[in-house]
Amino acid sequence: MLEVLIIGAGPTGLYAAFLAGLRNLKAAVIESSAEPGGQLTAVYKDKYIYDIPGFPKITAKDYIDGQVLQYERFKSDLPIYYNEEAIDIKKHDDHFIVTTTTKTIETKFVLIAHGGGGFVPQKLKIDEHYDNILYFIKDLNQFKDKKIVVLGGGDSALDWAIDLSEYTKDVTLVHRRDEFRALQSSVDHFREKGTILTPYIVDTVEGNDKLVHTLVLKHAKTHERLNLDADYIVVNYGFVLTKSRLDEWGIEGEKGLIKVDYTMKTSLDGIYAAGNGIDYPGKVKLISTGQGEAATAIQSITTLLYPEKTRKFEHSTALIKE
């Protein structure tokens, strides 16, 4: 039986796993996607993060790679199971039975670090699947000297358009409104590098062999049509969270966020939570605060598991011997 099961392998869950290993807890992690990193991997892999302590800037990928390397000190005794979603959590005597996609796991404590749920991109409304219509970007080098169309008007759409313009001179941003939700400075920056078409919506696509070669755009006001050739279409209409199971699990929350106390305990004894999926007075959604919450949760769980031990928090310099 596990002492703690961590749900989620984003920056908060990975740090919780490292801390659990540091304290010799019998633990495991389940992650609903195929790789670690949560939202950072799903949405911002090649983007720079500027608010991580100690890093003036670092790409999301490099940061998560560093976290995985930090965790791997304990990976032989603390596995991460990918493509495993937490479907049900039930109390049984003095422990919990957690049902996942393919497993049944018994654990004394649960730490939820799922960031509020999985992120699903809002799709372009077309009937066919095309291989060059993308909702995530994993390698910017694939776009070198290609014709790129970016769809969207938010900060992420503008960020991608700006980043892509470093790899090709042919980037067109299409937005359905004249006004942008993105920062005006980003709009002005991209306007110097690429083409902006507003207010246009995608009417149809033309393609063959699973590849789009032409977008047919329709002007939102005049209904005039415009054909736009493209090698790749990058869609950034935003993301929606998958449905929360909090109610099914009996965990108190509001608007999909888990309510916790100062120890990071939820409304159910034995279940703790940390990261962007929680709420309490003064909560700030930052990677660093989520990791601090993970430290609090792991310390709370450790104290309950081993009450005979000191409550003093031991630092890594005392716990790791090279």
Swiss-Prot record:
Binds 1 FAD per subunit. The keyword Oxidoreductase applies. GO terms for molecular function: ferredoxin-NADP+ reductase activity; flavin adenine dinucleotide binding; NADP binding. It is an enzyme of class 1 (oxidoreductase). SUPFAM superfamilies: FAD/NAD(P)-binding domain. Signal peptide: none annotated. Keywords: FAD, Flavoprotein, NADP, Oxidoreductase. Its EC number is 1.18.1.2. The keyword tRNA-binding does not apply. Its cofactor is FAD. It catalyses: 2 reduced [2Fe-2S]-[ferredoxin] + NADP(+) + H(+) = 2 oxidized [2Fe-2S]-[ferredoxin] + NADPH. InterPro entries: FAD/NAD-bd_sf (IPR036188), FAD/NAD-binding_dom (IPR023753), Fd--NADP_Rdtase_type_2 (IPR022890), Ferredoxin-NADP_redctase_2 (IPR050097). FAD binds at T12, E31, Q39, Y44, A86, F119, T317. Homodimer. Belongs to the ferredoxin--NADP reductase type 2 family. This is Ferredoxin--NADP reductase.
